[in-house]
Amino acid sequence: MTIKRIDPEDRWSEAVIYNDTVYYTAVPENLSGDIIEQTADTLAAIDVLLQRVGSDKSKILDATLFLADKADFAENGILTRRVPGFHPREAQRQMAISVTEVIDKQGVLIAEAGTGTGKTYAYLVPALRSGKKTIISTGSKALQDQLYSRDLPTIIEALDYDGTTALLKGRSNYLCLERLEQQMLSGGDLEAEVLADVMHVRQWSTQTEDGDISRCHSVAEDSKVWPLVTSTNDNCLGSDCPRYKECYVLSARKNALAADVVVVNHHLFMADTVVKDTGFGELIPDAEIMIFDEAHQIPDIASHYFGQQLTSRQLFDLARDMIVAYRTEVRDQVQLQKSADRLTQMVQDFRLSLGDTGFRGNLRELLQNKETKRYLTLLDDALELSYDVMKLSLGRSQLLDSAFERATLYRNRLKRLIDTTIAGYSYWFESYGRHFLLAITPLSVADKFRELIKSHKSSWIFTSATLSVDEKMSYYTDRLGLENATTLILNSPFDYQHQTLLCVPRYLPPLNQPYTAKRLAAMLAPVILKNQGRCFFLCTSHAMMRGLAEEFKASLPLPVLMQGEMGKSQLLKKFVSSGNALLVATQSFWEGVDVRGDTLSCVIIDKLPFTAPDDPLLRARIEDCQLRGGDAFRDVQIPDAVITLKQGVGRLIRDIHDYGAIIVCDDRLVSRPYGEVFLSSLPPSPRTRSLEKTSYFLSQRAQRNEIVSES
């Protein structure tokens, strides 16, 4: 069998076999001419191609795809020629080949790709080359927007891809014109600030084409107005809505259904797949390729959607809609106002009974407290009263009919949450600000997720920079029931031996003591000052974050920023624009934050990020592990902490020109046997226990970068 090139254009479209010859309508330049004169790498690719084609002519297009992917990522391949700044990376090429093979076989691939591997291109190119319907799911809205607005268009242009694409977010990301109109008609009792935002949204609504609220720059992303002018699956009127034909959610879904490539996020995907919550379920059966980026989040998100929950926000929203319906459509039913006020009051009282904010606890234990149980009973009674009052006015108001359906759902869900006798679930609650959440979560989602995969005959790709523990994938595969998946671990191309330094300081203060924050701040202030800020201090608790921020603000002549002082995006912008700031943060800043260059050259972590032992979700997983005969500390707690630590450390080096130090303020990393599991899971950085050497390393690298930039 021979290969002949029959079209001079630089793109792939079709291949045919005739007289035992493979004819390609466009072979890239590095495959043109006599194949005997090609490089060894090209010959190897051709050899694999011919082996895979064999005598089965139906395989020719898949084989073409395989060879095309190798050529795309070659030294003089199409990406090098068409994507500015693209440099071939062996790990990226390996991942692209693995993705191609899984697409061909309709298999499951779990790929850990270290920072800088270029995993986005490694899955985009094979997916687009295949021509199959593809869903790409991300862990955050930020990555979703970046993928759709930057990465996808780049690859589409490079490959001359002629398919269509769509971006689909959850319904709470789109303006609801009907709910906006309701607020305009009945907004008399709104706070002045919220009412002003309603007017801003009203003005923006006359200009927007897609209703995506992230584009309404005149209103803060965390404004209280957004829940009032967006819909949920519970309060949406569906086809009964007077503005149904103008619905932005409906329009976005139609675009997604018609598109060849759809970009969503994990919450949207799981909500639809598990509880049919988003209304784009028609996409799932049609999709032939499912790709999950930031896939380390999937186990926890899946647990959330395979369970049930009831939140104070849902109940406040229900009461609010009852009041709006009373004021605009059923003004003779004054009991609607009274029962809604009663429900609102009982929600507030129950929240107060839970005590401190930012606390997560065991719901089974909580309900043993007679006082708390009394408040929950009063809340249940108020919900029943609202249900009974709304029932008297059914058919008079679409808004009220929708609210009645939600009340029915919530009262049944609350009764399910109060019945803590059902085995196999974790019962837990969380209090935050003026709100609370009551939830039940299955102890394990492995069986359910395995069935989800089996029910869709598609190719499944899961990828992230943080999936393995101690260079093994078993922790991840066991949690999702994917023991038979193909796994791949690709190291980062960054030179951590020269770009980074890992420090575990000597003479650290004891953990979890009232004076820990004060002593840590005193110990680390000189390093931060000498580095001119440019530092993230990642904390494992809000209490430590607040304590450290207070100490640093009193002692450092630098901008000290703290998570919660403003929105996340605003905080990052201020950090970058300052150029010499210290950002003290927790939780959401451990991952999904990308700060490149000299602006960030030091990441400090207060201690190993073990989940609090009294966390109800952790306790449930520990119980499940023990029932299966496992060692909970080894099999659950350590892997959880390793993945989180890898995420935190990953904030530092985002580019080949970055440098910096990682300081972990926890002796256990070097004094306990399990510390080796953490160290072997981190990038291979040189290590020290000296803060002085760490400061010297940072100053030397800063000087070197200044010389390079000046030259």
Predicted regions and their residues:
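N-terminal presequence-like segments and the immediate start of the first folded domain
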Residues: 1-61, 67-74
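Conserved pre-motif I regulatory segment
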Residues: 75-111
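A substrate-engagement module of RecA-like helicase motors
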Residues: 75-82, 132-260, 322-323, 327, ...
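Signature of the SF2 helicase/ATPase Hel1-core->accessory helical subdomain module
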Residues: 129, 145, 150-153, 233-234, ...
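Conserved RecA-like ASCE P-loop NTPase motor core of nucleic-acid helicases/translocases
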Residues: 134-140, 462-463, 533-540, 663-665
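A contiguous, basic/glycine-rich beta-loop/short-helix subdomain that forms a polymer-engagement track
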Residues: 227-260, 270-280, 385-508, 515-522, ...
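Conserved RecA-like P-loop NTPase helicase motor core
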Residues: 505-515, 565-669
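Conserved helicase motor "Helicase C" RecA-like lobe of SF1/SF2 P-loop NTPases
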Residues: 540-564
